[in-house]
Amino acid sequence: MEGEIIINELIDAYEADEDYQSVKGVWTWNDFGRPIFTGMRVPTRDLTTIPKANWDGVDLDLYAKFHYEGHTHLPIQGSRGCTYKCTFCSETRVFRYRKGHDIAEEILEQVDKYGITHFSFVDSLVNG
């Protein structure tokens, strides 16, 4: 379900010359050229196991065009999912969150590594 985990598994499968069908949560093609779904994944409960964004090699002035009062912002995600069950929404109904110290650690890493001092929380449900 988490794209960060799936993309790493796809890269590992590619580098090992393995079939993409071994990676759950992906649409791919079978040997006959027909689309197949490799199966559902269980949502990751512990968001601290998801790799943090690596901005190395990214021109942050070009990437982060969102400037507020002259400051470049980077996205921070503290939670995923939602506690509500709105019928019109595609957000997963499993609410998961990161511990405060994990979020603070990521912010401090971004400040130290990239000199970024402004962040935008991109959570779907900030007050969950």
Indicate residue ranges for each PLM-predicted region.
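Radical SAM [4Fe-4S] cluster-binding motif and immediate context
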Residues: 53-128
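Glycine-rich beta-alpha loop elements in corrinoid/cobalamin-binding modules
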Residues: 1-43
